Amino acid sequence: MAAHGGSAASSALKGLIQQFTTITGASESVGKHMLEACNNNLEMAVTMFLDGGGIAEEPSTSSASVSTVRPHTEEEVRAPIPQKQEILVEPEPLFGAPKRRRPARSIFDGFRDFQTETIRQEQELRNGGAIDKKLTTLADLFRPPIDLMHKGSFETAKECGQMQNKWLMINIQNVQDFACQCLNRDVWSNEAVKNIIREHFIFWQVYHDSEEGQRYIQFYKLGDFPYVSILDPRTGQKLVEWHQLDVSSFLDQVTGFLGEHGQLDGLSSSPPKKCARSESLIDASEDSQLEAAIRASLQETHFDSTQTKQDSRSDEESESELFSGSEEFISVCGSDEEEEVENLAKSRKSPHKDLGHRKEENRRPLTEPPVRTDPGTATNHQGLPAVDSEILEMPPEKADGVVEGIDVNGPKAQLMLRYPDGKREQITLPEQAKLLALVKHVQSKGYPNERFELLTNFPRRKLSHLDYDITLQEAGLCPQETVFVQERN
């Protein structure tokens, strides 16, 4: 049985040697040697023989010679490795095995096959711009959307979005997450998606382990993949963020975004606007305090410069000027002060001015006092310019009713009233006047005490909670204060 098995193996070996010699034209001894080196694998022996140039040394009959040749033949077994390398550098990679890709050295070329792209560009030039849409390799299936991507940094992408008036769409890719690869394969390759991105967005794709990707992840606190977001290129504000997307959901989400925010053209497509915030009396108190302080300072300076002239006036003129503030100079100043009063009025322009009937109504008591004046004084009085209607004075006839029994020549309290409609009014009352006088004055302006309350901001106090019989001085409203009129809660 052993002899029969040995003869069968010998005949099989002879058959292989005969086939080897027939294919290669080598001698039987060379064929036997190559088959022994390749463990009787005819295909490998023929390949190794041809790779070696078709030349093989005759094996020696001595055992020592065989032992020296065998290590050499063992090295020859490694010959197929260059064959694999040869496929990797095949000049036509579309017909070879996929290439082992080099590490990404750029923020956008992690999956790019530059050689394939060069061939594609040459084909496009030869075909007059036509693109071969047949995907022949796995690399083509998962290739990034090179034609859509902005090839630059995050900052250059924002600048490009500002110049082209387009939103900035960010795609962070994680090569370890297959869902991210599916975005390249399914979503970014869709023609409808490409069209809407080209029209409205600057598309910036970056890999999570790149320098730019790490910086973006650290700043915008990214946690889940796949990741797609839309930013305002002018401010860098993240407007929306999506994770699980297919073609239909992407188109729905983007359509909804554009319907809400529009195009970035500065008109209907302006970025998400800040909520229009109604002007609050308390929020504006700091500005009003500053204005009141400046106005009071100007009035005090002006009062000192004209006190000498006022002393020479008649008693009747003095009585008509007891409650005058910033406008007392309108009724008594000559032409020397007209320019200064006019400049002061022009410098206090406000967006809330009411130049209608109320302006004339509030100015009337000041322009028609029952006083005796000489012709020169009357001329000056009638020729004075109009003053800001928002800085008003309590008319003397009204003041007489609320300050009976009080020394009207004593110290005054200058109050700036801020109404809910944005209008301002400055009044002057004696320090010993009751708080009730102020409440009645506000009621006369159409703000009843049942619905509206008075308060100050620094310190914050609700005057409506105080005793109305206390004086303005006791209420802490002297020498000047800003009082806000607001609706009760």
From Swiss-Prot:
Region listing for Disordered, in residue ranges: 56-77, 300-384
Annotated effect of mutating S297 to A/H: Severely reduces interaction with neddylated CUL2
Record cross-link Glycyl lysine isopeptide (Lys-Gly) (interchain with G-Cter in SUMO2), residues: K84, K134
Localization: Nucleus
Modified residues (N-acetylalanine): A2
Gene Ontology BP terms: proteasome-mediated ubiquitin-dependent protein catabolic process
Annotated ranges, domain UBX: 408-485
InterPro entries from the UniProt entry: Thioredoxin-like_sf, UAS, UBA-like_sf, UBA_8, Ubiquitin-like_domsf, UBX_7/2, UBX_dom, UBX_domain-protein
Record-annotated UIM domain positions: 285-304
Annotated UBA domain residues: 2-54
Biological function: Ubiquitin-binding adapter that links a subset of NEDD8-associated cullin ring ligases (CRLs) to the segregase VCP/p97, to regulate turnover of their ubiquitination substrates.
Domain text: The UIM (ubiquitin-interacting motif) is required to engage the NEDD8 modification on cullins.
Name of the protein described by the UniProt record: UBX domain-containing protein 7
Chain's gene name: UBXN7
